[in-house]
């Protein structure tokens, strides 16, 4: 079986935009990596139905590109909505019904919501650009709000934002009029919450904190979060420069994976108590430099990790579904400045 994947990249050095790759799940080898669509600053991509949405910019104009996924996995442009000059995005997602697109803007501390046509994939308009205005954290990286993630909750009723600059998670109501704050939760000063992933039961979530290298387990209910426990994602005796990046849960919901940039590793946690608790299994080297993102195949057999720096390795790990452990089976292909990994669903 061959699985198609997409890599979002920076385009500051050698990156060309969105890359498309093929993974042979019989051998665990990546058989090809090609430029899927040349797009400036396409650092995050996300799929909804037959459409792939990507953050992008042209000069000072910033926003979202909509790409059609053809039957063979190739990409063609539907349209772009470059409606702001306030900063380019770092995360993009779509509402489950495809009517809204959400974009997180790290540098300017903004949350954007767009109207989209769920039938054609066209981005119709920018509805709102909302600036976060909360007290910031104590770290020098927290000089202002920094929105790093914006996506819907499992109940589809809210949008949740991670703000690295203010140590807060904010939930919003959303609709044709834009975003309206519903609730906030504040973490420890200097945590720097970056990304979140949910257990499929919709009752628990896992937030990774970029600055403290901590993962928090949370209880979720109707737009409200409560922190349950905290775990370090790097060895306690490591004193080098490192910052946490991505978090993914295996499709069987049994294991949580987290990437550490600097330590250049993947932390593996066993999920217990129906998602309420996690326990460290191992911390494994990622196979390259600066592993900003990775993803797990639908089969749960493989994990593919992109590396932003060094030789830009695209590393394939074979997963043990029982223990959660991973082992490198392919480290030959590259994706320049790769920072986002998504598999075609």
Curated annotation (Swiss-Prot):
One CC-aspect GO term: cytosol
Domain of life, per lineage: Bacteria
Coiled coil: none
Molecular-function GO terms, alphabetical: 6-phosphogluconolactonase activity
SUPFAM superfamilies: C-terminal (heme d1) domain of cytochrome cd1-nitrite reductase (SSF51004)
Protein family: Belongs to the cycloisomerase 2 family.
Protein name: Uncharacterized protein SSP0869
Organism: Staphylococcus saprophyticus subsp. saprophyticus (strain ATCC 15305 / DSM 20229 / NCIMB 8711 / NCTC 7292 / S-41)
């Amino acid at each position: 079986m061959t699985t198609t994947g997409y890599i979002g990249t920076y385009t500051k050095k050698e990156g060309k935009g969105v890359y498309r790759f093929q993974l042979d799940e019989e051998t665990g080898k990546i058989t090809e990596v090609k430029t899927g669509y040349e797009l400036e600053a396409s650092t995050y991509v996300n799929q909804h139905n037959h459409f792939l949405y990507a953050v992008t910019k042209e000069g000072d104009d910033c926003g979202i590109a909509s790409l059609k996924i053809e039957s063979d996995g190739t990409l063609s442009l539907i349209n772009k909505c470059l409606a702001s000059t306030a900063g380019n995005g770092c995360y993009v997602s779509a509402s489950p019904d495809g009517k809204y697109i959400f974009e997180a803007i790290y540098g300017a501390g903004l949350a954007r919501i767009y109207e989209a046509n769920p039938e054609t994939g066209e981005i119709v308009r920018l509805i709102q650009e909302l600036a976060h205005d909360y007290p910031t954290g104590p770290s020098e990286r927290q000089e202002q709000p920094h929105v790093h993630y914006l996506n819907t909750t499992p109940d589809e009723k809210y949008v949740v934002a991670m703000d690295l600059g203010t140590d807060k998670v904010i939930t919003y109501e959303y609709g044709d009029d834009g975003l309206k704050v519903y609730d906030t939760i504040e973490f420890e000063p200097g945590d720097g919450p970056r990304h979140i992933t949910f257990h499929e039961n919709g009752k628990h979530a896992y937030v990774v904190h970029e600055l403290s290298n901590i993962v928090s387990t949370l209880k979720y209910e109707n737009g409200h979060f409560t922190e349950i426990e905290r775990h370090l994602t790097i060895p306690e005796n490591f004193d080098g420069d490192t910052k946490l990046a991505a978090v993914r849960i295996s499709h069987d919901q049994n294991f949580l994976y987290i990437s550490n940039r600097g330590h250049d590793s993947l932390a593996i946690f066993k999920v217990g108590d129906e998602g309420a608790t996690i326990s460290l299994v191992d911390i494994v080297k990622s196979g390259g430099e600066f592993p900003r993102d990775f993803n797990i195949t639908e089969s749960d057999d493989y994990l593919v990790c992109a590396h932003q720096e060094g030789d830009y390795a695209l590393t394939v790990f074979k997963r043990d579904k029982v223990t959660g452990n991973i082992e490198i089976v392919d480290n030959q292909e590259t994706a320049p400045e790769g920072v986002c990994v998504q598999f075609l669903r």
